[in-house]
């Protein structure tokens, strides 16, 4: 019997319980002061498209080389507490042959893993999605934990449109998020709960506020039903922003105010931290909004942090494609700059003057 087979068998034995102390410790570590999460969990297709867009021929090796370059950046661990990986990436190695999970762990960065299998059409609900991946999740989590992962992510997609989201869409996605969270915690992984209300559309910020409130309330109700240990979990929500086609865009200050208000009304105080998604915002907007939230005089019970993908990587990818031969030095510098800017936003100390 192989080690993986043994672990899979063990995971199904009765009496296995979550380690609440471990979950709470790792959840707090992920939102430790001045640090946030790098979302490097793009699917093979998405990452290939981004490579092709900057003139790099897509392949498994190209995806590995780009990410290995990011993870070799000197000093980024001061601003990055965890990295979300894709299934392909968690099985890959650095240029020197060291497993990527080992490289991250030795820097004091927790490896994480995307465990959902994508958003699919919700039957009988045109234009709406349900995220799949619960089948076999327990066994996958057992394997990922053995490979070094200590947290996981599952993304639900909520679209605003004519008559949507429906209550069926909200409930089914909230239920899936809760079941995912319970399974992850059973297997020792901190679940990052990501119900994303998309920016697509012409809706205003008040509609975004209402829909975000609805999915957050539904999700935490389902988490309670499923026995999810909230102090051992994190939330990855969207900010309250008008649809990208809306003519009435609100100020950065209003985004910060409305976002904190929405969270205060709908998120349990026991949750240790909130790690925002960037959701198509510009690099600087994502940083500025987080900075303003952390500058507010209103006290909130959670750490407010980041779990950004493109907002941390976009400039780094462009520079890597232009200077592959320079050992990725300019790419590493671009990544480190954005990481440091968001680190400053954690304490409300960022300013546009620092962007250079």
Name these PLM-found stretches.
Residues 2-4:
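Position-driven detector of the extreme protein N-terminus
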Residues 6, 10-147, 160, 248, ...:
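Alpha/beta catalytic barrel-like cores
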Residues 59, 154, 193, 235, ...:
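Conserved, mostly hydrophobic/aromatic
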Residues 68-72, 97-103, 110, 126-151, ...:
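Alpha/beta enzyme core
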Residues 115, 156, 195-197, 237, ...:
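Short glycine-centered, acidic/aromatic-flanked micro-motifs in structured strand/loop junctions
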Residues 118-122, 157-164, 198-202, 242:
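Conserved radical SAM core fold
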Residues 145, 156-158, 162, 223:
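Structural motif corresponding to the C-terminal cap of alpha-helices
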Residues 160-171, 203-206, 281-289:
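Active-site-adjacent beta->alpha loops and helix N-cap segments on the catalytic face
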């Amino acid at each position: 019997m192989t080690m993986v087979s043994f672990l899979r068998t063990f995971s199904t034995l009765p009496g296995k319980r979550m380690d609440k102390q471990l979950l709470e410790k790792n959840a707090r570590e992920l939102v430790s002061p001045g640090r946030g999460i790098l979302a490097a969990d793009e699917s093979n297709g998405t990452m290939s498209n981004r490579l092709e867009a900057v003139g790099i021929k897509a392949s498994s090796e190209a995806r590995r080389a780009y990410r290995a370059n990011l993870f070799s950046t000197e000093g980024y661990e001061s601003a990055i507490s965890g990295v979300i990986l894709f299934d392909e990436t968690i099985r890959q190695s650095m240029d020197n042959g060291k497993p990527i999970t080992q490289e991250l762990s030795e820097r004091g960065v927790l490896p994480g893993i995307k465990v959902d299998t994508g958003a699919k059409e919700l039957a009988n609900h045109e234009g709406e999605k349900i995220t799949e991946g619960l089948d076999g999740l327990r066994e996958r989590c057992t394997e990922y934990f053995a490979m070094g992962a200590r947290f996981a992510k599952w993304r639900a997609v909520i679209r605003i449109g004519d008559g949507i989201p429906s209550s069926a869409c909200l409930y089914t996605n909230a239920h899936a998020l809760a079941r995912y969270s319970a399974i992850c915690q059973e297997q020792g992984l901190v679940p990052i709960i990501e119900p994303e209300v998309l920016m697509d559309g012409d809706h205003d910020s008040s509609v975004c506020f209402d829909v975000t409130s609805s999915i957050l309330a539904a999700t935490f109700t389902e988490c309670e039903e499923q026995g999810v240990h909230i102090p051992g979990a994190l939330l990855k929500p969207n900010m309250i922003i008008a649809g990208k086609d809306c003519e009435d865009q609100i100020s950065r200050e209003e985004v910060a105010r409305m976002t904190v208000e929405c969270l205060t009304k709908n998120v349990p105080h026991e949750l240790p931290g909130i790690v925002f998604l960037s959701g198509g915002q510009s690099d600087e907007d994502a940083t500025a909004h987080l900075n303003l939230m952390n500058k507010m005089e209103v006290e909130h019970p959670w750490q407010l942090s980041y779990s950004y993908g493109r907002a941390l990587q976009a400039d780094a990818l462009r520079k890597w494609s232009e200077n592959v031969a320079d050992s990725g030095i300019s790419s590493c510098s671009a990544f480190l700059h954005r990481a440091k800017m968001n680190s400053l936003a954690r304490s409300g100390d960022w300013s546009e003057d620092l962007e250079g």
